[in-house]
Amino acid sequence: MSFPNSSPAANTFLVDSLIGACRTDFYSSSNMYMPAATAEMGTYGMQTCGLLPALGKRGEVNHQNMDMTVHSYIPQTDTWADPSRSCRLEQPLNQMSTCTFSQSIKEETNCCMYSDKRAKVSSSEIPAYSSLIPESCSVDSPEIPVPGYFRLSQTYATAKNPDYDNETMSPNTTLMQLNRATPKAQSTPFVEVEKKLAHDRDTRSSSPAQSPEPKVSTLEEKNCSTEASVSSPELPHREGKESKNDTPTSNWLTAKSGRKKRCPYTKHQTLELEKEFLFNMYLTRERRLEISKSVNLTDRQVKIWFQNRRMKLKKMSRENRIRELTSNLTFS
């Protein structure tokens, strides 16, 4: 079929034109009146909406399927399908061969202007429907206009397009504003950090110049601590306790079950005491004083360590003796 490009009905079939025609032009008492300009438009809209079946061959009209009494909202449609009317569509044979539609096709396969009900047209179906799809109903268009009585007027479409453009541009503008605002928000912490660093440097540079006396006092305290460590042998004992608390993962400080051993002695001190215990389990007072000086422990600490070591040896020997006795016994 061919429409003149100048007429507005060539591209879209408008709702308001159909309503106005149905009220005034199409009906006069019981007879139907259709002008020559709107005759082709009416039959084209009825065919695309599924009200009239498609023509199978050129010049053939199925009179049984042309009965349109099912649609109660369009009266006197039987006269539209009269073959003697001048509104019959004559289409070329090569176009109508690809446009044969079965009666089982649902109305939902038509174009819809609502985004959630768009028809998903595949690449294989495009050439078959290309002859019936108007120019305004393109596949790639974001909103596909509805054929027939669902189409809106061009004035509404032109009025809606600026709003849609404004809505699409608004997210971009907001993103640009956010992008402009974020560098400021990010730059403020860096400026604050730089100010703090500069302030700390100033305070550090001013503090040595203002207070040279605390340095002298700290040196005196260090000297006193070294003298006290030489005079009193109990300080290494305390330092050994602190070092043990700092390193609880060492094997000689933890038991097999993971329990922390109560060991106030350093590893070097325990090794020296163990070597002396191998040579002699009982020490004289003179030898005990010598060992205490070499290991930086008091005489009493060395005495207690040897007592505990003898008790440990006694316990281990008892356990070994019991184990040997029980291993020789056989239970029947």
UniProtKB/Swiss-Prot annotation:
GO process annotations (BP): regulation of transcription by RNA polymerase II
A GO MF label: DNA-binding transcription factor activity, RNA polymerase II-specific
KW Membrane (keyword) present: no
Disordered: annotated span: 194-261
Q: What is its main location?
A: nucleus
Q: Which SMART domains match?
A: HOX
Matching InterPro entries, A to Z?
A: HD (IPR001356), HD_metazoa (IPR020479), Homeobox_CS (IPR017970), Homeodomain-like_sf (IPR009057), HXA10/ABDB-like (IPR046333)
Q: Which PROSITE patterns match?
A: HOMEOBOX_1 (PS00027), HOMEOBOX_2 (PS50071)
Q: Is the keyword DNA-binding in the record? A: yes
User: Gene Ontology terms, cellular component aspect?
Assistant: nucleus
List the stretches of this chain annotated as a DNA-binding region. 258-317
* Pfam families linked to this entry: Homeodomain
Bias category Basic and acidic residues: which stretches? 194-204, 235-245
Q: Which UniProt keywords apply?
A: Developmental protein, DNA-binding, Homeobox, Nucleus, Transcription, Transcription regulation
Q: What's the family?
A: Belongs to the Abd-B homeobox family.
What is the annotated role of this protein in its UniProt record?
Sequence-specific transcription factor which is part of a developmental regulatory system that provides cells with specific positional identities on the anterior-posterior axis.
Q: What is the protein name stated in its UniProt record?
A: Homeobox protein Hox-D10a
Q: Which organism is it from?
A: Danio rerio (Zebrafish)
